[in-house]
Amino acid sequence: MEEKQAFNPFLPEYEYIPDGEPHVFGDRVYVYGSHDKFGAPMFCVNDYVCWSASVDDLKSWSFEGVIYRKRQDPKNRLGLRLLFAPDVARGKDGRYYLYYAFDFMGMMGVAVS
């Protein structure tokens, strides 16, 4: 059996996910967080993405894709607001709730899947 080594950071060097929030759903760990862009003049300018790994293999992470585009929020149709520090919860109804803060506005947003 080939051994893999875990590194810190565990995501690829091109991926910047500060404020990471890990959650176990089923047999996978999902990491949600703000999404920075290399060389950008501000933080949290990208849409939200998610990475996951099997709870049995935290060395092999998979890109789950974009989970929420900042322009999807009705208060941010132009995409001018930055979204900070997201977190996810699974509701009793089985749906997933993505909570996020708008930059410097004192408001929270929620998206439901």
What are these regions (language model features)?
Residues M1-S113:
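Carbohydrate-active catalytic/glycan-binding domains of CAZyme proteins
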